[in-house]
Structure formats: C-alpha cells, structure tokens
C-alpha cells in the first residue's frame, strides 16, 4: 500500500529490458484489457461467482461502520472459508487501524465481522526514525501482506502488523513500526490471546501491551510461531513491515506483496506487485535473480496472485491495467507460460465514502496460500476489496473454461438447480443477492435488489452464434418500482439488444436513442419471452407470452452473441480512465436500503433457429 517511487519504477524498467532468455513467468497471449470498459472487453471465465462478504456503513456502532476496508486474506480450515482484512475509520494510513475476521461454510453466506486485532495505542513520546512527529494519544495503523498461518499440528492463526503513521506522507510499512502480532482462531470463530510474534527495533516486552509469544505456556503454540519465523516463504511476506536488516528475511529489498507457488520440478515461483517475478530452487532461501517484470504481463501497483489449481494447472489473478479494473486471470499448463486473459469481475460498485488513497475497482486480490487449506469443492477461491471499501470473494470453477460447447437448457424447478447455478456468472452484493431460492413448492434463480448504489447481475454463457433463439421464463414480484435489464452480448460483453422490465409494468426494448414499448407484465405472473436474433441483419423477432411476433432492430451491431445478461440496474460507466482518484466526498443516502425488488428466473433455453 506504500505508493512506490520513481527509483523503483526505473529499476523495474531496467530489469525488464535486461530480461531476454531468462527462464521465468511470462504472458504469451495477445489479449489486452480495454480500460474504457469496466469489464475490459475480456472473455469471461465461465461460472465465476463474485460474492460480497461485507458492505461498509458509516453509521451505527457495529464493526462495518469504518469505511476503509482493504487487503483481505483467505484461508480454508475445518470446513470453513476464513477472510481477514484491515480497516480504518475513513482513509488509507489514517489511524486508528484494526483487523477483522469473517468466516463461511459455503463461501456465499458470511458471518458478521469480528475484531481480531483492535486499535493499539502507540507509547506517548515515541518519535519515529527519520521523522520529527511525536506520538501523543496516537494509535497504530495495521498493514500486513500475510494474514493466516496453519501450523503443522493443524491449528489456524491470524496475523497482523501494527505500523506507525504520525503525519502526512508517513507510511506504516517503512520498517519503523511496532511489531507483528498473532492469535489463534478456534473452530467456532472464537480467538485466543494476542501475542507479539516479532518486534521492530525499539519495541519489546518493556513498552508493548501484549506478551511475547515465548511467554505462552502453550508449547505447541510456540512451535507454530517458530515454524512460521523459520519459513523463508512466510517471512518473505513480512519484508515491508520488518526491520530493514531483519536476518530472517531472505531477500531484503523493496518488493511488495509477495505470493508464490511451486512448479512440478520443485522450484518456487515468486510474484510481486508490478508483475515482478523470480525463481527459487531451495524453497525461498535464495533467489536465482533479482525480481524482474514478467514479460507480457500488465500490472501496476496492485497485487498479483498466483497458485496451482486442483487440475494441476496454474493461474494468476490480477488487474491487467494501470488501473484497478477489471479483475482478471490467466492460465498456464506449466506455471511459466500464461496464454490467456479471462474476466473474473468486471463491475465497479459506486464508491459511497470518500477517503485518502481510495482507488476504484476490485483490487488487492489474494487467494489461499499453500498450507492454509484446500477448498473441498476443488475450485479456486480469491478475496479482494472493492474500492478499498467493501470486501468480496470470488469462486472460479476448476477446470477454468472460456466457453461452453452445448446450448443451454436450464430449468431451475428441477432437482439439479444448484448444478445449473454453478454454470452462471454472478455478481452478488449483500443487498442485491443472486442465488437459488425456494419459492412456494418450486425453486428459481432469484435476483434481489435493495441497494441504491449497486445491482444484482447474472450472466449465462452459451455457444457463440450468429443466429440464436432464446426462450426465457421469469416472474417479477413488483411492477411499481425497480427494473430488470435483459441483454444479449458478444463474447467481449458488448450488447446488441436490450429488453427492460421498467418500474411501471412495461416491457421496453432499446431502439437507438429511445426505448420502444413491446408489452407489459403483471406482478407475480410469469413472463415468457421468445426471441430470435440474426446478428448479420441486426434484426430480432420477439414474442411475449405467445403473442404476435414483432420485428425489432438491434441498437448495436455485433458479429455473434454468446452471453445472456440479467441485471437489476443500468450499465455503469463511472469511473473511467480520466476520473480523478482519491474521491473526497460521500454519496448521500449510502446507509439506506430502498424497497426490495425480486425477479425469479424459472428457465432459459438457447438453440439454433430452424
């Protein structure tokens, strides 16, 4: 989260130029993200589910009331997903700071956050090395690149770091903080006593509030702490906050946000911000070359995550731009050569609360590091913040696919509704949930929306087609508020047609600048849409509830269509590449829900027209 320097960027550039035949991670694909679109015009990873775990609120006394929430970490332990994240009241590096913890059995329904590490008082009179500011009634700011450690005996620990910020342009990760703390997580979500794991210079048992881990009577806990401290791959993730001459850290350089995975031959691949990379043949003790920018990768001052997936391949997840959108992934068969670039999350929620250094977009991605659990479903799970404000996770099905071979025949009243749901791509905020619900004696894919600043979204990918028939059956639970937009898009997310269930009971279609009425709908009564599109002619025929077909012109030409989009709101185009960063204002009404809307999707069928 340190803003970096011109010197570092110059070093990265020089190293990149020098990199020629080095055996290293590289991106060989030709696809690039287009920053003018939140989704980057990227092909979607089929079945990616994006789920909000925490929505920040300014009012109230509960833990989500702090509106800077960032840098989440993830683990899987005892059949639960665990996420920790750091939090400040308003902005980045503005004290006080704390770390919070959430958990979930299924990755979709999450516990309320609880404080793992509370605000910590800096000793009065403390003067930070290199600065003249003196601490008076001051509190620490938390900053950590590693959030969990699972011991050899199977115990889970949450970690954090108390850094010091005493004035403008000060940073908590400059090596002049207080120290790293550790705490056991219990299977029921409770936590043990807080201990210091490692002090920074000038701090020790004489001037800190928590005991040093050596003082614990739990020998297995002490063993777990010492195992962490002796593991170079764990310690590499502490370099930013640690003493600059800490002998336990193998590579004491200003590289940020380390992640790693092992190749089939046992070598460790390291990844850092700016898509820097290096290799280690001895488990991280030494590195074969100073980190260099991975050829072909595009990544700025945001994290890049890499891991082995359950099918034996490898994946990196990152923002492939100089901005923090979209969130995308690349896949490799050998862990070195990455060949594609697929969309994970192409939405940007409205930033409801201003604050220092708050960047737009889904960012600071982190997965489950080796040793911290393997999800039972075999899928890839990552966590990240949205706008440094809300906390999200994504479930990415493994094997990772960018297309489907068979046309869709999804009937959600059937017994395999959950299997069908896994083939949809969803964007599911806490106040706009997307999921399979039981409605009466049947089940449906349900989109809800009670958030004035967000929307629910569900996409279904089908085989790329120049001509396609789509049969969609759904029910709206209201006609006097809310709206649902239905689009057919090409593989890059570009819509060619849009139907709208508006807030007055009308069904509209977008015709250039204007919307044209094509029918009406009734609360609680199913709507059956039968649509046949010819992309070459740009016309589509539309029949509603078996009525007479109407001929309609697409509002944007595309060569093919391969995605149905259902969205409880309009397309978002803010922010863009020219939007100033560091938003310093709040959006009015961000605390309030509006009257919920609900849309029930009963079935979807696509086919080649006769």
Feature annotation, model-predicted:
Residues 22-67, 76-141, 150-302, 308-358, ...:
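Beta-rich carbohydrate-recognition and catalytic domains
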Residues 61, 135-136, 354-355, 456-462, ...:
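Beta-strand-rich interaction surfaces with strong enrichment in secreted/lumenal proteins
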Residues 64, 459-470, 518-525, 595-600:
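Extracellular/lumenal carbohydrate-interaction signature centered on repeated Trp-anchored short motifs
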Residues 416-444:
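Extracellular glycan-recognition surfaces and repeat-rich motifs
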Residues 439-507:
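Secretory/extracellular carbohydrate-interaction modules
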Residues 470-472, 524-534, 540-542:
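Short tryptophan-centered beta-strand motifs in secreted/extracellular beta-sheet-rich domains
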Residues 507-530:
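Short, aromatic/His-centered strand-loop micro-motif at the edge of beta-sheets
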Residues 552-599:
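Flexible glycan-contacting loops in extracellular carbohydrate-active proteins
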């Amino acid at each position: 989260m340190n803003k970096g320097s011109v010197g570092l960027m110059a070093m990265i550039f020089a190293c990149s130029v020098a990199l020629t035949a080095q055996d290293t991670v590289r991106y060989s694909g030709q696809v690039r993200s287009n920053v003018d679109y939140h989704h980057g015009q990227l092909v979607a990873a089929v079945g990616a589910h994006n789920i909000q775990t925490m929505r920040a609120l300014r009012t109230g006394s509960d833990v989500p009331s702090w509106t800077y929430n960032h840098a989440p970490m993830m683990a899987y332990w005892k059949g639960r997903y665990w996420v920790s994240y750091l939090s400040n009241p308003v902005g980045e590096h503005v004290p006080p700071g704390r770390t919070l913890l959430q958990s979930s059995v299924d990755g979709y329904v999450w516990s309320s956050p609880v404080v793992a590490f509370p605000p910590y008082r800096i000793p009065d009179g403390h003067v930070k090395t290199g600065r003249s500011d003196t601490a008076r009634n001051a509190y620490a700011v938390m900053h950590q690149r590693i959030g969990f450690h699972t011991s050899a005996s199977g115990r889970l620990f949450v970690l954090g770091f108390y850094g010091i910020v005493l004035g403008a342009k000060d940073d908590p990760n400059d090596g002049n903080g207080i120290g790293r703390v550790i705490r056991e997580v219990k299977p029921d979500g409770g936590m043990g006593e807080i201990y210091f794991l490692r002090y920074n210079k000038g701090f020790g048992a004489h001037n800190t509030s928590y005991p040093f881990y050596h003082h614990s009577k739990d020998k297995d806990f002490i063993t777990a702490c010492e195992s962490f401290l002796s593991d170079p791959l764990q310690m590499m993730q502490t370099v930013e906050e640690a003493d600059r001459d800490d002998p336990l850290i193998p590579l004491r350089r200003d590289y940020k946000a380390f992640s790693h995975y092992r190749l089939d031959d046992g070598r460790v691949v390291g990844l850092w911000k700016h898509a820097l990379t290096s290799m280690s043949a001895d488990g991280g003790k030494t590195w074969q070359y100073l980190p260099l920018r991975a050829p072909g990768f595009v990544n700025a001052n945001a994290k890049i995550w890499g891991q082995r997936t359950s099918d034996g391949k490898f994946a990196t997840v990152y923002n492939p731009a100089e901005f923090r959108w979209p969130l995308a992934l690349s896949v490799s068969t050998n862990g070195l050569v990455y060949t594609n670039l697929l969309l994970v999350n192409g939405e940007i929620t409205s930033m409801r609360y201003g604050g220092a250094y708050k960047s737009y977009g889904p960012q600071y991605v982190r997965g489950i590091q080796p040793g911290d659990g393997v999800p039972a479903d075999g899928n890839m799970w990552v966590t990240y913040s949205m706008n440094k404000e809300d906390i999200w996770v994504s479930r990415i099905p493994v094997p990772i696919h960018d297309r489907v071979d068979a046309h869709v025949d999804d009937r959600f009243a059937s017994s395999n509704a959950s299997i069908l749901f896994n083939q949809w791509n969803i964007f599911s905020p806490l106040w706009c949930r997307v999921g399979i619900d039981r409605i009466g004696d049947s089940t449906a894919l349900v989109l809800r929306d009670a958030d004035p600043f967000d929307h629910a979204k569900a996409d279904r990918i089908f085989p790329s087609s120049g001509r396609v028939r789509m049969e969609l059956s759904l029910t709206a639970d209201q006609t006097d508020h809310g709206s649902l937009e239905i689009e057919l898009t090409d593989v890059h997310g570009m819509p060619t047609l849009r139907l709208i269930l508006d807030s007055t009971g009308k069904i509209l279609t977008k015709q250039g600048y204007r919307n044209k009425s094509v029918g009406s709908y009734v609360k609680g009564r199913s709507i059956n849409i039968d649509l046949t599109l010819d992309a070459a002619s740009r016309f589509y025929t539309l029949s509603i509830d078996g009525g007479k077909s109407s001929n309609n012109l697409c509002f944007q030409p595309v060569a093919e269509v391969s995605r149905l989009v259902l969205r409880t709101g309009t397309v978002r185009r803010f922010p863009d590449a020219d939007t100033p960063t560091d938003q310093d204002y709040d959006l009015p009404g961000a605390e309030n829900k509006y009257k919920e809307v609900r849309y029930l999707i009963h079935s979807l069928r696509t086919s080649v027209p006769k």
